[in-house]
Amino acid sequence: MHPAHLLVLLGVCVSLLGAARIPPLPLSLDDFSNLITCANRGSRSWLDYAHYGCFCGSGGSGTPVDDLDRCCQVHDNCFGDAEKLPACNYLFSGPYWNPYSYKCNEGEITCTDDNDECAAFICNCDRTAAICFAGATYNDENFMVTIKKKNICQ
């Protein structure tokens, strides 16, 4: 093996060792899934809401199919407001990737005081949505409704 190849191989190995020690970045989406579990006391996973109605999950359009879907519409609007805050205006990330601090105690969610302005705003958006989800009726027919009824969300 040529010495240049050994140098490249050594560089790759060192890079991989360094990368393995980098802890994963906590994300607002991870926090939101935990708040959902907290508010509904583990009765439903965040995955149950990922493709529900016209507004739960990525994007959103049309008219909400029910109260639960309306919770998602309000959450989308809240994040839209967060994106307009100077404190939440990040070049490549925005509020969806900003972690925040919170406490969960027997279904009660508290956004902690150590959050910066953007994290506090996002935490309150997610907290409000999680509580709304827990209080709304889940209709299995509205899960993946955009696939079942193609034109429902236009």
UniProtKB/Swiss-Prot annotation:
List, from the UniProt record, the residues annotated as the active site of this protein.
H75, D126
The residues that the entry says bind Ca(2+) are: F55, G57, G59, D76
- EC identifiers of the protein: 3.1.1.4
In its keyword annotation, does this UniProt entry include Ligase? no
What cofactors does this protein use? Ca(2+)
Q: Which residues form the propeptide?
A: 20-27
Class of enzymatic activity (EC top level): hydrolase
Keywords from UniProt, A to Z, are:
Blood coagulation cascade activating toxin, Calcium, Disulfide bond, Hemostasis impairing toxin, Hydrolase, Lipid degradation, Lipid metabolism, Metal-binding, Secreted, Signal, Toxin
Q: Which cysteines are joined by disulfide bonds?
A: C38-C104, C54-C153, C56-C72, C71-C132, C78-C125, C88-C118, C111-C123
Its subcellular locations are: Secreted
Q: Which reaction does it catalyse?
A: a 1,2-diacyl-sn-glycero-3-phosphocholine + H2O = a 1-acyl-sn-glycero-3-phosphocholine + a fatty acid + H(+)
Point out the signal peptide segment: 1-19
Cofactor details (free text): Binds 1 Ca(2+) ion.
Give the record's GO biological process terms.
Answer: arachidonate secretion; fatty acid biosynthetic process; lipid catabolic process; phospholipid metabolic process; positive regulation of fibroblast proliferation
| Any one GO cellular component localisation term in the record | extracellular region
Q: In which tissues is it expressed?
A: Expressed by the venom gland.
InterPro entries (alphabetical): PLipase_A2 (IPR001211), PLipase_A2_Asp_AS (IPR033112), PLipase_A2_dom (IPR016090), PLipase_A2_dom_sf (IPR036444), PLipase_A2_His_AS (IPR033113)
Q: Which GO terms describe its molecular function?
A: calcium ion binding; calcium-dependent phospholipase A2 activity; phospholipid binding; signaling receptor binding; toxin activity
Describe the subunit structure: Monomer.
The family line of this record is: Belongs to the phospholipase A2 family. Group I subfamily. D49 sub-subfamily.
Q: What does this protein do?
A: Snake venom phospholipase A2 (PLA2) that shows moderate enzymatic activity and exhibits procoagulant activity. PLA2 catalyzes the calcium-dependent hydrolysis of the 2-acyl groups in 3-sn-phosphoglycerides.
Instruction: Give the protein's recorded name.
Output: Acidic phospholipase A2 1
Organism expressing this protein natively: Pseudonaja textilis (Eastern brown snake)
Q: What taxonomic ancestry is recorded?
A: Eukaryota, Metazoa, Chordata, Craniata, Vertebrata
